[in-house]
């Protein structure tokens, strides 16, 4: 049996007899994700589905992100890397983009944000209707006030900081940005108890 990869994100699983004359499509191969954003020290498990045999995982830039023989990616330092998987019955390889951003403390984040007050003065219009401001992350694109929060986040946490969601108030910290009714975004400067 062999796997033929049509695109980096999806493979076609084919079965063939030993002389390669009778080939049949029997399924598809895929990875659980093709784009990962991590902070330094964090990990993400990659999985290759629909293949058999021993798979080989490799990082294009082990100084930025490593991957072990089971597909566990670890963020080492800020930058970009490509994680590829090959072997087994996979012909070719499949890849996942990894962006790593730096680890930063809440105190450092607040200090960096406050240092930007001269650049981002109060009273500037950063509404969603103002399409002049655009920002893009590895897993998000936006305009207006979200773009402002994204731009500040890039300067505080690094260009490849992940856009994540959580609903646990205790996890909110300086540097997080909060969406209010899907209409407006604010940047957290400091957390005091429940405010």
Spans of features found by a protein language model:
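Generic detection of intrinsically disordered/low-complexity segments and helix-coil linkers/edges
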Residues: 1, 28, 40, 51, ...
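Basic/aromatic-rich interaction segments and small domains that mediate binding to polyanionic partners
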Residues: 195
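Generic recognition of cysteine residues
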Residues: 2, 48, 96, 140-145, ...
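Secreted/periplasmic proteins that engage bacterial cell-wall peptidoglycan
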Residues: 105-192
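Extracytoplasmic soluble-region selector
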Residues: 3-103
């Amino acid at each position: 049996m062999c796997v033929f990869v049509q695109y980096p994100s999806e493979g076609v699983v084919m079965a063939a007899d030993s002389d390669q004359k009778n080939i049949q499509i029997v399924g598809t191969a895929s990875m659980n994700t093709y784009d990962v954003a991590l902070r330094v020290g964090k990990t993400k498990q990659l999985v290759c589905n629909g293949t058999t045999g021993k798979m080989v995982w490799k990082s294009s830039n082990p100084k930025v992100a490593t991957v072990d023989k089971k597909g566990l990616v670890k963020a080492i330092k800020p930058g970009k890397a490509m994680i590829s998987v090959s072997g087994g019955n996979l012909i070719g390889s499949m890849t996942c983009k990894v962006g790593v951003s730096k680890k930063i403390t809440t105190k450092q984040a607040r200090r960096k944000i406050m240092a930007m007050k001269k650049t981002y003065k109060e009273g500037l219009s950063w509404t969603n209707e103002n399409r002049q401001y655009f920002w893009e992350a590895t897993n998000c694109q936006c305009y207006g006030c979200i773009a402002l929060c994204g731009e500040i986040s890039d300067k505080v946490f690094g260009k490849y900081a992940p856009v994540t969601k959580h609903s646990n108030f205790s996890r909110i910290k300086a540097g997080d940005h909060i969406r209010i009714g899907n209409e407006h975004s604010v940047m957290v400067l400091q957390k005091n108890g429940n405010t």
